[in-house]
């Protein structure tokens, strides 16, 4: 069987869509479902399209790791140092040395705990209802609803946040986040299990409500994406039957991963710079408009 170049082209289109939408509040999953249906990428049997989307999401996540490597690596080192220092403090006679190490590594430890706390709610729901979510929520109809609902929520919550920010203090340093704030953001991340809602939009809205600045909420969203998506991806990749893979599939997989990674590198940098100057309203308006158009296309049976 020869190489299907048309299928590879379709796969690369999906990878570009993933890279463009994963970290902006418009729902990458929703767009991949929609575009996949439009170009007939989702018609291949055996579950390859679903597995492919998981792999290219990992490519997007790798972009976060590369761009924020200094923060991630230093936090991991400090997190482990704090744990070992705490153990040493309890078991060693040289308490002064370990107390100093605890103080020096506390920032990284708190950051790590915040990421863990923020990951737990969606991880629990995702594990408990993984199959139900895949069966009942992954459709163009639910995506259309998610686009509209998420867009309206973005407008309302951002307006309230900007009013509140004028009269009360907001957290502008990610290392100053509290455990309560990370838990609230994590609870909002559960909304992202609904395709069309957007993980980025959900967590940023949770950040606004908890008192985080837009930049801090967005960067925390990036960090939450690493365990959330690696965990969800691992489950799907473990279940997939690789014996049915052909040369076209493998080429699509490798190229798609690379393309999603490169596009995400560019988008993350541009998105953060955009947020420092302008509000999210443009994304919210786009979501509502796209949701309405999608609903019309479904109603008129242009797409199913």
From Swiss-Prot:
Recorded hits in InterPro entries, A to Z, give: UppP (IPR003824)
Indicate the secretion signal residues.
none
Q: What does this protein do?
A: Catalyzes the dephosphorylation of undecaprenyl diphosphate (UPP). Confers resistance to bacitracin.
UniProt subcellular location: Cell membrane
Q: One GO molecular function term?
A: undecaprenyl-diphosphatase activity
UniProt organism field = Clostridium perfringens (strain ATCC 13124 / DSM 756 / JCM 1290 / NCIMB 6125 / NCTC 8237 / Type A)
Name this polypeptide is given:
Undecaprenyl-diphosphatase
Q: Name one GO cellular component term.
A: plasma membrane
């Amino acid at each position: 069987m020869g190489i299907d170049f048309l299928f590879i082209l379709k796969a690369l289109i999906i990878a570009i869509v993933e890279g463009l939408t994963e970290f902006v509040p418009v729902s990458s999953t929703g767009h991949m479902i929609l575009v996949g249906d439009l170009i007939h990428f989702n018609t291949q049997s055996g579950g390859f399209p679903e597995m492919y989307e998981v792999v290219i999401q990992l490519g997007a996540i790798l972009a976060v790791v590369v761009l924020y490597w200094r923060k991630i690596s230093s936090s991991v080192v400090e997190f482990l140092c704090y744990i070992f220092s705490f153990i040493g403090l309890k078991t060693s006679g040289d308490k002064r040395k370990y107390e100093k190490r605890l103080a020096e590594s506390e920032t990284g430890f708190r950051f790590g705990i915040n990421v863990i706390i923020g990951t737990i709610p969606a991880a629990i729901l995702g594990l408990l209802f993984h199959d139900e979510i895949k069966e009942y929520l992954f459709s163009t109809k639910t995506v259309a609803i998610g686009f509209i609902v998420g867009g309206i929520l973005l407008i309302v919550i951002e307006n309230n946040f900007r009013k509140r920010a004028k009269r009360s203090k907001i957290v502008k340093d990610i290392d100053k986040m509290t455990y309560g704030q990370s838990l609230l953001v994590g609870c909002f991340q559960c909304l992202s299990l609904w395709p069309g809602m957007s993980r980025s939009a959900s967590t940023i809205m949770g950040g606004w409500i908890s008192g985080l600045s837009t930049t801090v909420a967005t960067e925390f969203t990036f960090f939450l994406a690493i365990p959330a998506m690696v965990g969800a991806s691992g489950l799907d990749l473990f279940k997939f039957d690789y014996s049915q893979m052909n040369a076209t599939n493998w080429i699509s997989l490798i190229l798609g991963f690379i393309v999603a990674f490169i596009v995400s590198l560019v988008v993350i940098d541009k998105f953060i710079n955009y947020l420092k100057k302008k509000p999210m309203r443009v994304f919210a308006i786009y979501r509502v408009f796209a949701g309405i158009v999608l609903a019309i296309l479904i109603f008129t049976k242009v797409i199913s």
